[in-house]
A protein has these predicted regions:
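Bacterial Sec-dependent N-terminal signal peptides
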Residues: 1-13
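A short structural micro-motif
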Residues: 80, 98, 111-118, 215, ...
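Short, structured motif recognition centered on aromatic/hydrophobic residues
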Residues: 70-79, 108-109, 205-214, 243-247
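Acidic, glycine/proline-rich low-complexity segments that act as flexible tails and inter-domain linkers
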Residues: 12-68, 121-203, 232, 249, ...
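Electropositive phosphate-/nucleotide-binding environments in soluble metabolic enzymes
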Residues: 20, 24, 46, 85, ...
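Extended intrinsically disordered, low-complexity coil regions enriched in Ser, Thr, Gly, Ala
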Residues: 67, 83-106, 119-132, 218-242, ...
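Short, glycine/charged-rich beta-strand-loop motifs at protein surfaces that mediate ligand recognition
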Residues: 198-199, 212-217
Length: 270
């Protein structure tokens, strides 16, 4: 699904992780991600670090069929959405350590822009670019744009329509002043034309990450629509469920449970 190179040998297969206790798995995943040692008793709050490390890296990381690269990209879009910039910088390094490319990570954060707004994405990219620079990665990265001024609507609509139909156009038709048509066009041009058409990540991955961003902000109507789109894009309900669970330690149980209930209760005709 992702544009990527080979992964390091880390604990991510179901067969292997099912045979490991959570402490062993936590230590292995943590070292692969951050290069240090988990559960070392250091710092000012070793107890909460012990709890969160075992929970995230020893339990959540073996829940569902997601590779470790996808898990780290999900973590990064959660942190970008919540504007937790120091943690985002740290997880940028972790993502690079497990094989996420700079282009993939940048595209994952860019994908948040139509949902959380451009200022937050610019803030997030400051943290990401700091991590890149410290690793000797030259910025700006290579362009991934694939559309022109002339075809951005057409190319965006080619992605949007099979996944969402004309629901947004219909929903906006009664906006005062006839401006709903403009809003629907903006969505097609910006979300799908300017972002979804970009190279670096495929539509299936972008839809999964988008669902995670919507989970963070609790956008219930959009969670319904984007679940349907995820299934059309090739993600299973089980995969989307695993992605939401990956968000859970960072966003808390209530927001994650809202998204999980939507997945659980979804019917194809919804």
């Amino acid at each position: 699904m992702l544009v990527a190179g080979s992964l390091p040998a880390i604990a991510q297969t179901t067969e292997k992780t099912n045979d490991m206790d959570r402490i062993e798995l936590c230590k292995e995943n943590y070292t692969a991600l951050f290069g240090g040692e988990a559960l070392n008793g250091g710092g000012t709050d070793p107890e909460i670090m012990d709890i969160l490390q075992k929970y995230i890296f020893g339990e959540v990381f073996r829940t569902g069929d997601l590779d470790i690269k996808t898990r780290e990209m999900i973590t990064c879009v959660c942190l970008a959405t919540m504007q937790q910039l120091p943690q985002l910088k740290g997880h940028t390094g972790a993502a690079l350590n497990v094989g996420v490319t700079p282009i993939e990570l940048r595209e994952a954060v860019y994908q948040c822009a139509p949902i959380i707004g451009f200022p937050k994405v610019l803030n997030a990219m400051t943290a990401v670019n700091e991590a890149f620079t410290e690793r000797g990665i030259k910025v700006p990265l290579e362009t991934q744009a694939t559309v022109t001024e002339e075809n951005r609507y057409e190319k965006g609509h080619e992605i949007q329509y099979p996944l969402y139909g004309d629901r947004m156009k219909e929903a906006m038709k009664d906006v005062p002043g006839g401006m709903g048509e403009k809003v629907a066009r903006f969505l097609t041009e910006v979300h799908f034309g300017d972002f979804q058409t970009r190279s670096g990540l495929d539509t299936q991955t972008r839809e999964l990450l988008t669902y995670c961003v919507l989970t963070v902000i609790g956008a219930e109507p959009q969670l319904h629509a984007h679940l349907r789109a995820n299934l059309k894009a090739g993600n299973s309900k089980e995969r989307v469920t695993a992605a939401v669970i990956q968000c859970m330690p960072y966003i808390g149980f209530p927001a994650a449970l809202k998204a999980l209930n939507i997945i659980k209760d979804f019917q194809p005709e919804d």
